């Protein structure tokens, strides 16, 4: 799996700027006000062939005992515990501060590898900037500039040297590999135990975190399967925002290794933003998806109707997925859930013949033509499959850039129905044929061809022959003179 790198440091040393550099995004807010990043943001990046996750923490104020800064410090310590490597960021302009020393004392107690990065080092003497930070006893300081990128590549390259090359993606396995994902304490491990029929995973009635996801191989009706459980062996502890946030990283890691994701929701709790975030990542990754609404037996009929309304409102983008209302503890609804997992896997790995895809496309266009965009009406000619997991359909034609989102949804539903693609995202790509008359004014004009009569061609050919004969005679004369001397 991808290693997770946590960015640690006191407020306003440039963690969010470095985060943006490492992920090539602007997901974390960047401002000169200390403490602006009050929770952890997470993203992923890649150096060469090695991918990684990165967490941008809030500023670490270790001397504060209460209030929001104290909560930020708790989240930071949680990130250190869960990360595979820590980048401790200090400010090269401000220099070494007492807060830096306190944070360094905490980090030296951590079993995680810590890399000291002296930020805002652009334009300065590296040796001078790094000198005073040797006092922190965290190894060789790396002088970098998060804003300009100086030294960042070499820092991350050194961190990733200690992690093995990524293995081949299990998502391409020849059997279903499904990840059980969701927020803490929604019943993921209980569901895994119910599917396996034995208590292979320790589960407590208390939310916690895990160092590693657990891969469990098993057979069902003679067929091989692999479950990736993101709950794992839990630590007893208070459920706080840090635990909630870090569950996203675990879900992201598991989803990338799976070809089906099982999203577990808690019927006794409201649908949270965290649920939508995890579901959205599975959708973005193109994974087949099944949703298990757990603890269904413990709520009233009125509450059940409310949960269904919340799901349709907050998780509307999962209209392709099959929803199951289950009780993992009492093992109710598990058989139907497993049937949907198998069906979603089959749909994600489907191979669709090109003639049938094209026929479905033509029928859809005959039934409802794409609307005009100004004077242009898109013309669709044929389609073929462009990939699996998720299935991709490539449509060829003219002026396809004018296709509206609503018409793409219409085509998606048409293809989904024709090929029974329940439980998997379906992506449609448009391959636009180049129009030779488009932007004709901007293209260099070719010289017009002149018509040449047959008599003119003969005259030119005879002229070339005469010229060639004269050249041969001159050459013979010059050669004779040369050897006669």
From Swiss-Prot:
Binding positions for GTP 1 per the UniProt entry: 9-16, 56-60, 119-122
Gene3D superfamilies per the record?
3.30.300.20, P-loop containing nucleotide triphosphate hydrolases
Which residues does GTP 2 bind? Answer: 182-189, 229-233, 294-297
- InterPro entries according to UniProt: AAA+_ATPase (IPR003593), G_ENGA (IPR031166), GTP-bd (IPR006073), GTPase_Der (IPR016484), KH_dom-like (IPR032859), KH_dom-like_a/b (IPR015946), P-loop_NTPase (IPR027417), Small_GTP-bd (IPR005225)
> Which regions are flagged for Basic and acidic residues bias?
457-469
Which Pfam family is one of this chain's hits?
MMR_HSR1
**What domain of life?**
Bacteria
Bias-annotated ranges (Basic residues) = 470-485
Q: Name one GO biological process term.
A: ribosome biogenesis
Please provide, alphabetically and separated by semicolons, the GO molecular function terms listed in this UniProt record: ATP hydrolysis activity; GTP binding; ribosome binding
Q: What happens when the gene is disrupted?
A: Essential.
- KH-like domain: which residues? 350-434
What are the boundaries of the region Disordered? 435-485
Span of domain EngA-type G? 3-167, 176-349
User: Briefly, what is this protein's role?
Assistant: GTPase that plays an essential role in the late steps of ribosome biogenesis.
Q: Which family does it belong to?
A: Belongs to the TRAFAC class TrmE-Era-EngA-EngB-Septin-like GTPase superfamily. EngA (Der) GTPase family.
> How is this protein organized at the quaternary level?
Associates with the 50S ribosomal subunit.
Q: Which PANTHER family match?
A: GTPASE DER
Q: What is this protein called?
A: GTPase Der
